[in-house]
Amino acid sequence: MAERNELHKRNRHNGQYDFSRLTEEYPPLKKFIVLNAYGTTSIDFFNPRAVKALNKALLISYYGIRYWDIPKNYLCPPIPGRADYIHYIADLIQPDISDESTGLKTAVPNTRQYRCLDIGVGANCIYPIIGQTEYGWTFVGSDIDPVSIDNARKIVTCNPALAHKIELRLQRDSRKIFEGIIAPNEYFDVTLCNPPFHSSKEEAEDGTLRKLSSLKGKKVTKAQLNFGGNANELWCEGGEFRFLLTMIEESRNYRKNCGWFTSLVSKEKNLGKLTAKLKSTDIAEHRIIEMHQGTKTSRILAWRF
């Protein structure tokens, strides 16, 4: 699991993790190092403490983030996959970026300041961290969970490089996405979102159990399940499809406030109905961008007016 094939060309995490570098930068990672079934150095990716330590090491080593932490039972995101979304968004809003660029800010043409809105920033604040450190973008991150907003704000204030570059806003109405967050005269070059894709806690738990059982090659019980992510991060009424329908509907009211609207779509079966909805919404253009991470394929749905 240490190998991540077919990530974006500018993704710093292509190939295998350099555990020698990572443990030197963050020594607490050492106690989680194991040899996997192939005899190579790795960690137990089913151990949330190990994954959290790996994230801290990656953020220190590759992004210069000296402080990063999340509350217990909150989502601990895989950084390589999150970075891919940012790099593909960069291709969308900065089409002059060369495929030979290394991912360093100095290698990326950036003649003006790009401003981004992360819907559901989470306690981890990972998209703004990567977007700011890689491309110099500024961010507004919104969330309906006060604990997530407070934790993300602490991450920002504890890292001087992020200060005044990332703003956090609490969404006080869980039924709304852009309303109450985007001010009338405000403009964003792009919006990002990793929506909750399950429609209930039970569905979320069952989905995770199936995934872990498949990966481990044996049945995993709920007693063994370490369920990373709270309710707001993992499920909402109507699931991913209903959430994105609401986003598309609301985006019409903010067509002059945003250059591109984007979201991850985890369930391929939702794409047909979502694109049909977009075509009936008088948009100028929509795109489906595929991202490949080993055997996993995920998709970004993007549209503009």
Swiss-Prot record:
GO molecular function terms listed in the Swiss-Prot or TrEMBL record: 23S rRNA (adenine(1618)-N(6))-methyltransferase activity
Catalytic activity: adenosine(1618) in 23S rRNA + S-adenosyl-L-methionine = N(6)-methyladenosine(1618) in 23S rRNA + S-adenosyl-L-homocysteine + H(+)
Keyword Transferase set for record: yes
Main location: cytoplasm
Enzyme kind, highest EC tier: transferase
Assigned EC number: 2.1.1.181
Gene3D superfamilies linked: Vaccinia Virus protein VP39
Residues annotated as signal peptide: none
Keyword Cytoplasm: yes
Any single Gene Ontology cellular-component annotation: cytoplasm
Domain of life: Bacteria
Places the protein is found: Cytoplasm
InterPro entries linked to this entry: METTL16/RlmF, rRNA_lsu_MeTfrase_F, SAM-dependent_MTases_sf
SUPFAM superfamilies (alphabetical): S-adenosyl-L-methionine-dependent methyltransferases
GO biological processes: rRNA base methylation
Keyword tags: Cytoplasm, Methyltransferase, rRNA processing, S-adenosyl-L-methionine, Transferase
Matches recorded under HAMAP family: 23SrRNA_methyltr_F (MF_01848)
NCBIfam families: PRK11727.1
Family, as annotated: Belongs to the methyltransferase superfamily. METTL16/RlmF family.
Function, as annotated: Specifically methylates the adenine in position 1618 of 23S rRNA.
Protein name: Ribosomal RNA large subunit methyltransferase F
Lineage: Bacteria, Pseudomonadati, Bacteroidota, Bacteroidia, Bacteroidales
This protein's encoding gene: rlmF
